[in-house]
Amino acid sequence: MYDWLNALPKAELHLHLEGSLEPELLFALAERNKIALPWNDVETLRKAYAFNNLQEFLDLYYRGADALRTEQDFYDLTWAYLLRCKEQNVIHTEPFFDPQTHTDRGIPFEVVLAGITGALKDGKSKLGVDSGLILSFLRHLSQEEAEKTLDQALPFRDAFVAVGLDSSEMGHPPSKFQRVFDRARSEGFLTVAHAGEEGPPEYIWEALDLLKIQRIDHGVRAIEDERLMQRIIDEQIPLTVCPLSNTKLCVFDDMAQHNILDMLERGVKVTVNSDDPAYFGGYVTENFHALYTHLGMTEDQAKRLAQNSLDARLVKP
C-alpha cells in the first residue's frame, strides 16, 4: 500500500520549510557556518525529537533554524524538501517560511528569500514540482512586528501567493492580527492561518470572519462545534490537516483517535500534509500510510484526500 500511496499525484499545502531541516543537513550547516550545536551527533538529536506539546517542539525548531545563515543554506534546505516532493509524487507544494525567525537573528529578508525562491524555480524546471510560497507571521510576536515583515515583503510581492499565521497558538488568537491581514489583502495577498490545532473552535471562527482566510491550517478542533462544521462543509473551506504532527504534539493521544476520516466522510474538504516532517517522523506519503495503518483508510478515501489537496491549491494550474 505504501508504494501505491507514494505514486498517487498529490499537493502539499501545509509544510514549514524550516521544519523540513533534517538532522544530517542541520549538522552539515552547523559545520559550514562554524556553529556549536548542543547535540553530539545526529542520533542524539533524533532522540531529542520527543515533544509533549507545541511549545516544546517550537523551542527545538527555533534552535535548529539558527543554523540557517546564508542564501546557499536556504537554497539547500528548500532543495532537499523538493527532492522529497519528487520522490513522493507531490506535484505541487505551497510551503510556508517564517521570515521573522531569521530577520530577528540579523539575517536579511532578501537573503532568506533569494535562497528559497532560487530552489523553488529550480524545482519547477529540473524536477517538475510546481509551487507557491506563503509568508507566515509568528503569532507569539506582536502585530506591529508582523507589519514590519509585511513592509519588507512588499518589494518582493510577486514571490508570494499568500500570507499566513503560525507558531504558538494558545493565547494568540487570530484577532490579534486583523489589521496586518487587512493590509495584506489590500496589497493583493491571499490569506491562510493556523487555527484549531491546540486553540479552540473560536479561533477558527476568528480566522474565517476577521482574517478572511481562504484555507484553515490544521482545524481539527472544528469538529467540537457543529455550527462551524456546517459552515466549513457548506462553503467547502479546505483544512490542511497534519496527522503525524497531531499525534507527535499530543493533539490526539494516538493516530487511532484522529478525526480526519470522520471529517472527510462528513463532506469536509480535508487534505493530508506533513507540517514539519524532519521533526514528526514523515513526509506526505508517511502521513497517508499512517491513516491506512491506524484508521483503515481505503484506496477511495486516499484518492479523495489527494484530489482535495489538488483542488485546494491557491495557485491554480
From Swiss-Prot:
Residues bound to Zn(2+): 14, 16, 194, 275
E.C. numbers: 3.5.4.2
Catalytic activities: adenine + H2O + H(+) = hypoxanthine + NH4(+)
UniProt cross-references to Pfam families, sorted A to Z: A_deaminase (PF00962)
Highest rank taxon of the organism: Bacteria
Residues at the site labelled Important for catalytic activity: 218
Record-listed substrate binding positions: 276
Presence of keyword Zinc: yes
Annotated function: Catalyzes the hydrolytic deamination of adenine to hypoxanthine. Plays an important role in the purine salvage pathway and in nitrogen catabolism.
Protein name (database record): Adenine deaminase
Organism: Pseudomonas savastanoi pv. phaseolicola (strain 1448A / Race 6)
